[in-house]
């Protein structure tokens, strides 16, 4: 049997596709394209949160005006549209873990958690319950057949590449998902929106952290976890106490501006000692990292990760969404998975993702990745930090 444009057997009119509609231009264009091609399209929007500042600010997602925009687009396309109340689930699976992670001194990525749980687990099951053959989204990433399964690849428009936030997508989910925008540049997507007469054609893109009003994540964390605003010491990696801070929630590893101390030297946040409410600072070279140990690894390569050779596997690693993939070696032994960064990286923090690719091109395959549990710096900085933390532990035990 021949395959349709979604690589599914059967004619488009016999193929039901649920489209995850956020109310933005990308997911609206996905619904419009599929409807134009003759598919049986059903729009679904998740109501994830509903607090005043986010509902009314421009660029939010999955609340207030966005839900209304998705409804209007669906009506103009002539497709059924459903709104599902996932507020409690979103808080449980995304917002609370986000706050907990920050309190523990990590730098979390809530978009990954949202994709991993709410969007690609709960919503996917809803799509199946609706009898859909596939769930389509407006993410900028590509998938195509790879033997009996499908594999993920970076999109044509690398400026919009969302593969970093999708590394935790499981093989089962990948096989069911479709990403119709992966082969299109953003400018063309907006042109298609104009052609389709969509009311959201000129709507601005949503923010990375959709549930944080005005981008001030410290406000929501302080409200959910007041201890994150507890004051503490700002300590140099060499052991000197330089000043005080008003909560580790206001700091992140790699930060230079707004540290709150003036010593005449360029200082960066190199570690957040959450247990002792300390912000550890030091020179830029103390941030240099060459090895990261991963947890919650989602491996999408063809060879089982446990079967990697002792010499490791040459890959390209991305440790921040805004940075390009860089040469690295992936290793796995004794139940541990780690990545050795050939050129080193600065500002790596626990809680961030390390995403793995076949190369650094826009056609690179996504091999999955994991969350950074810990990292190793240059030997001198690593020893100084180890000594500083050990002294704090002794003081706490005394």
Curated annotation (Swiss-Prot):
<dbReference type="GO" id="GO:0005524">
    <property type="term" value="F:ATP binding"/>
</dbReference>
<keyword id="KW-0963">Cytoplasm</keyword>
<feature type="site" description="Interaction with tRNA">
    <location>
        <position position="139"/>
    </location>
</feature>
<dbReference type="InterPro" id="IPR004506">
    <property type="entry name" value="MnmA-like"/>
</dbReference>
<feature type="site" description="Interaction with tRNA">
    <location>
        <position position="352"/>
    </location>
</feature>
<dbReference type="Pfam" id="PF20258">
    <property type="entry name" value="tRNA_Me_trans_C"/>
</dbReference>
<dbReference type="Pfam" id="PF03054">
    <property type="entry name" value="tRNA_Me_trans"/>
</dbReference>
<feature type="binding site">
    <location>
        <begin position="20"/>
        <end position="27"/>
    </location>
    <ligand>
        <name>ATP</name>
    </ligand>
</feature>
<keyword id="KW-1015">Disulfide bond</keyword>
<keyword id="KW-0820">tRNA-binding</keyword>
<feature type="region of interest" description="Interaction with tRNA">
    <location>
        <begin position="160"/>
        <end position="162"/>
    </location>
</feature>
<dbReference type="InterPro" id="IPR023382">
    <property type="entry name" value="MnmA-like_central_sf"/>
</dbReference>
<feature type="disulfide bond" description="Alternate">
    <location>
        <begin position="114"/>
        <end position="210"/>
    </location>
</feature>
<comment type="function">
    <text>Catalyzes the 2-thiolation of uridine at the wobble position (U34) of tRNA, leading to the formation of s(2)U34.</text>
</comment>
<dbReference type="GO" id="GO:0002143">
    <property type="term" value="P:tRNA wobble position uridine thiolation"/>
</dbReference>
<dbReference type="GO" id="GO:0000049">
    <property type="term" value="F:tRNA binding"/>
</dbReference>
<feature type="binding site">
    <location>
        <position position="138"/>
    </location>
    <ligand>
        <name>ATP</name>
    </ligand>
</feature>
<keyword id="KW-0819">tRNA processing</keyword>
<keyword id="KW-0808">Transferase</keyword>
<dbReference type="InterPro" id="IPR014729">
    <property type="entry name" value="Rossmann-like_a/b/a_fold"/>
</dbReference>
<dbReference type="Pfam" id="PF20259">
    <property type="entry name" value="tRNA_Me_trans_M"/>
</dbReference>
<feature type="active site" description="Nucleophile">
    <location>
        <position position="114"/>
    </location>
</feature>
<keyword id="KW-0694">RNA-binding</keyword>
<keyword id="KW-0547">Nucleotide-binding</keyword>
<dbReference type="GO" id="GO:0103016">
    <property type="term" value="F:tRNA-uridine 2-sulfurtransferase activity"/>
</dbReference>
<dbReference type="InterPro" id="IPR046884">
    <property type="entry name" value="MnmA-like_central"/>
</dbReference>
<feature type="binding site">
    <location>
        <position position="46"/>
    </location>
    <ligand>
        <name>ATP</name>
    </ligand>
</feature>
<dbReference type="InterPro" id="IPR046885">
    <property type="entry name" value="MnmA-like_C"/>
</dbReference>
<feature type="active site" description="Cysteine persulfide intermediate">
    <location>
        <position position="210"/>
    </location>
</feature>
<comment type="similarity">
    <text>Belongs to the MnmA/TRMU family.</text>
</comment>
<dbReference type="GO" id="GO:0005737">
    <property type="term" value="C:cytoplasm"/>
</dbReference>
<protein>
    <recommendedName>
        <fullName>tRNA-specific 2-thiouridylase MnmA</fullName>
        <ecNumber>2.8.1.13</ecNumber>
    </recommendedName>
</protein>
<keyword id="KW-0067">ATP-binding</keyword>
């Amino acid at each position: 049997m021949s395959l349709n444009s979604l690589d599914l057997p059967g004619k488009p009119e016999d193929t039901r596709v649920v489209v995850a509609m956020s109310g933005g231009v990308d997911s609206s264009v996905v619904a419009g394209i599929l409807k134009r091609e003759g598919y049986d399209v059903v729009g679904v929007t998740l109501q994830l949160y509903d607090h005043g500042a986010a509902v009314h600010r421009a660029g939010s997602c999955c609340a207030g005006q966005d839900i209304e925009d998705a409804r209007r687009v669906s009506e103009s396309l002539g497709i059924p549209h459903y709104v599902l109340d996932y507020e409690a689930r979103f808080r449980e699976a995304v917002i609370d873990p986000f706050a907990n992670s920050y309190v523990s001194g990590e730098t979390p990525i809530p978009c990954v958690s949202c994709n991993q749980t709410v969007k690609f687990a709960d919503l996917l099951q809803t799509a199946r319950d609706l009898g859909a053959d596939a769930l389509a989204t407006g993410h900028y990433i590509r998938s195509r057949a790879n033997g009996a399964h499908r594999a993920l690849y970076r999109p044509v428009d690398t400026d919009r590449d969302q593969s970093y936030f999708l590394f935790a997508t499981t093989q089962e989910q990948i096989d069911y998902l479709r990403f119709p925008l992966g082969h299109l540049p953003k400018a063309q997507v907006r042109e298609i929106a104009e052609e389709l007469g969509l009311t959201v054609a000129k709507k601005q893109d949503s923010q990375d952290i959709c549930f944080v009003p005005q981008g001030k994540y410290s406000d929501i964390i302080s409200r959910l976890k007041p201890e994150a605003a507890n004051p503490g010491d700002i300590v140099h990696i060499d052991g000197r106490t330089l000043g005080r801070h008003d909560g580790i929630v206001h700091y992140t590893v790699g930060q230079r501006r707004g540290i709150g101390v003036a010593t005449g030297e360029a200082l960066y946040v190199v570690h957040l000692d959450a247990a002792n409410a300390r912000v550890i600072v030091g020179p830029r070279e103390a941030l240099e990292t060459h090895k990261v140990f991963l947890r919650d690894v989602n491996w999408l390569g063809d060879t089982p990760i446990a079967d990697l050779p002792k010499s490791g596997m040459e890959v390209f690693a991305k440790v921040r969404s805004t940075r390009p993939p860089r040469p690295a070696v992936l290793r796995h032994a004794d139940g541990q998975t780690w990545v050795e960064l050939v050129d080193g990286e600065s500002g790596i923090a626990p809680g961030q993702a390390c995403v793995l690719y076949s190369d650094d091109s826009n056609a690179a395959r996504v091999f999955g990745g994991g969350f950074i549990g810990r990292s190793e710096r240059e030997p001198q900085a690593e020893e100084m930090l180890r000594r500083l933390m050990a002294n704090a532990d002794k003081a706490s035990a005394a």
